UniProtKB/Swiss-Prot annotation:
Cross-link (Glycyl lysine isopeptide (Lys-Gly) (interchain with G-Cter in ubiquitin)) at residue(s): 25
Phylogenetic classification of the source organism: Eukaryota, Viridiplantae, Streptophyta, Embryophyta, Tracheophyta
Top-level taxon in the UniProt lineage: Eukaryota
Pfam families cross-referenced by the UniProt entry: DUF1604, Surp
Keywords: Growth regulation, Isopeptide bond, mRNA processing, Nucleus, RNA-binding, RNA-mediated gene silencing, Ubl conjugation
Role description: Functions as a component of microRNA (miRNA) and small interfering RNA (siRNA) biogenesis. May assist DCL1 and DCL4 to efficiently process and/or recruit the precursors of miRNAs and siRNAs. In the miRNA biogenesis pathway, associates with the DCL1 complex that processes primary miRNAs (pri-miRNAs) into miRNAs. Binds pri-miRNAs and precursor miRNAs (pre-miRNAs). Is required for the interaction between pri-miRNAs and DRB1. Required for general proper plant growth and, in particular, initiation of vascular development.
Start-end of Polar residues biased regions: 499-508
Listed Basic residues bias regions: 848-857, 892-908
Keyword Ubl conjugation among UniProt keywords: yes
Protein name: G patch domain-containing protein TGH
UniProt keyword RNA-binding, yes or no: yes
Acidic residues composition-biased segments: 701-711
SURP motif repeat placement: 405-447
Amino acid sequence: MGSDEEDFVFHGTPIEREEEIASRKKKAVAGASGNLRTLPAWKQEVTDEEGRRRFHGAFTGGYSAGYYNTVGSKEGWAPQSFTSSRQNRAGARKQSISDFLDEDEKADMEGKSLSASSQFDTFGFTAAEHSRKHAEKEQHERPSAIPGPVPDELVAPVSESIGVKLLLKMGWRRGHSIKEVRASSDARREARKAFLAFYTDENTKETPDSLVSETEVETSLGEDIKISESTPVYVLNPKQDLHGLGYDPFKHAPEFREKKRSRMSANKEVGFRKPLSMKESLFGPKSGKIAPGFGIGALEELDVEDEDVYAGYDFDQTYVIEDEQPARQSNDNRLRLTSKEHDVLPGFGAAKNSDYSMERFNPPIIPKDFVARHKFSGPLEAETKPTVSAPPEVPPPADNNLKLLIEGFATFVSRCGKLYEDLSREKNQSNQLFDFLREGNGHDYYARRLWEEQQKRKDQSKLTLDVKVSPTVQKMTAETRGSLLGEKPLQRSLKETDTSASSGGSFQFPTNLSDTFTKSASSQEAADAVKPFKDDPAKQERFEQFLKEKYKGGLRTTDSNRVNSMSESARAQERLDFEAAAEAIEKGKAYKEVRRATEQPLDFLAGGLQFTSGGTEQIKDTGVVDMKSSKTYPKREEFQWRPSPLLCKRFDLPDPFMGKLPPAPRARNKMDSLVFLPDTVKAASARQVSESQVPKKETSIEEPEVEVEVENVERPVDLYKAIFSDDSEDDEDQPMNGKIQEGQEKKNEAAATTLNRLIAGDFLESLGKELGFEVPMEEEIKSRSKPEDSSDKRLDRPGLKEKVEEKTSSLTLGSEEEKSRKKREKSPGKRSGGNDLSSSESSGDERRRKRYNKKDRHRNDSESDSSSDYHSRDKQGSRSRSKRRESSREKRSSHKKHSKHRRTKKSSSSRYSSDEEQKESRREKKRRRD
């Protein structure tokens, strides 16, 4: 083959076979470059963007339409969700063909439509916008070291547009503007002509055309040489900050940029000097920046995480702002015009011939027969309305001090009113300086000066009312608000209407004010008609004085009824009586209520009375009680606040007042201590009065005696003591009488026995389980008799049941032998005849005894064996020393009990058996032991 290939000359790139290329990427590259030999249609494979086979068999995955032969995404295809609610109704959704197309099919569809690509975008705006949006979309999906959106400067289109390429080929250079040079020159020429025509003088003979022609030549030469260039942005805005290159801090907040720019321009225009900061000082550092964050630490190494928290705070700027404010106030005067020349703005000239004339209109002439129906007078016009004509003008007095005194006094009287003049006249009767008040020296000048001050004050008040107060801005009162809302006004009393009618809209000094401090005619009539203490004239007089001085100027009097002969307690009681009587009179109570309040016979109240402050008292009937006129006055009460137990529990705090009684009311002074007497004295006196008023007939009636059962209140006993203590201690502590005591004792005994039985049963059951013994059930114990029950409790071991049964059988045998002996003694003649029977009986008895002794020996042997086994188990298998001790104690007690039981058995058998039988039994025992 090598020799064959040398004979041929190859031109171009060889076409490769698809079967020879194994790699998918190489195959894709060869297919894209056109170096791959085409196969027939039935052998070709369709692949997607990533080189994956599309139309393959259904059993291997089917149609490749998504994420690695899956549908949609890695998780799979998500169906459309349908949501509809009352607030958000689901609308009719229009379906398009793009909803059912694959990505490859969409690409094929877009290839058929015409759209400007990024390559043919003229200035690259579309490409830049597309790349910026794509970068913002990726920013949300992936984390980034730079937070926020990506700056526009970092995102630039990859390729230049075709328009930029064409402009560069046509001779355009970057940085130059694209416009006609002649257009700008023509515009400048026209503007220069207009400017020169406006400012040329009439007397000048030189025409503006000559000037224009000269400038045209100069500019045309300059324009030919100079090519117009677009001024770069960085020349217009030079860098004056410490930010990074290209960084704009006001990108997302342009309003702050404008504010800063206006502030800087204002500072330049005004021209005031900035205060010397650390940057401009001679002793300041050359860097111009003082490290504000001193707390970072000088010895620590700077790291990425060590950030200066004060780095963004400009200390110099705050220092400048603090010192700028007074400087601005001082420089405001420079902006003012020193002289207005012709009242013309700069850059304009005043017209010599002005056709404008100000047209004025005269006020309308009022006809003579006009009658004014409406008068709009001010609220203070009635007060300041002069009753007499103006006094004549009088020259001031020669004495300068008197003149100053008159002028100052006149202004003060016009401000405060005529009342101050009357008071000054009364107080300064002997002073010669105030003779002008008594028509003396300087009276005419004072009258004239007072009138002038009043007129001046009247004009000022009118002016302020016209300027400030208008019908729409007036302060809304309660009456106007109610009328606007349609509310029904409350009914006023007769007293309020009289006072409002007498006022007349202007302030008047109350003429009846003295009636509250002196005795008026109406109060004298009421005092004569109502005398609650007429039996005691001195007390009645003190009561009247108390009513007069009850509320003097709104304050309670202290020494209203001071009598030297009375004690403190009597005076306090009298004060309380007077208060109660006054309250009863004011509220219009009936005769019985007043009598109950004062605790004295009051036969005076024919009708209710109401005391007022002015002297317009009104007598009302007893049936009608005016609740509005009744006045209640506040009273001070002092008491100790105690928290609720639930509140203390909620806050997890101990109750500080648990088990403590509330304290008695503390006496504030000596009179209160005498007034607040204990209630026991009152109760004792009331009891004595009730006993004296009981008639004698009631004493004869005998009341039936009622037997009261006294409950035995027991002391609280501890739970442990109630369970495990003896009944004798309880009997000593709790003495009882009669049947109740006996019944209680029986109950205690029954409870103690049942409790002991339960405790013993539980203890024995637990002990038997530990030792491996069987414990009899409770039902078996109940079926036995009482002595057996007691013996079972004492001897609770295996084989004990059989021993007790044998004991009972031996007792029955003994009783039968006694009966047979008695029969023998009664019938001595029959002994010979009954020898055979007795011998047979005795032989039967001997056999039974032998069997019993054998069983007894076996039992003893088994008991000894079990005890030895138990002893060995106890020594080897016990877990603690306490259990060993308890088991040894139980063992000893059980051995003692068994030994006693054996003795009782032997004694009983010796009673009912003969000596021979005992001897025989002993012999047999010895033989067995040997």
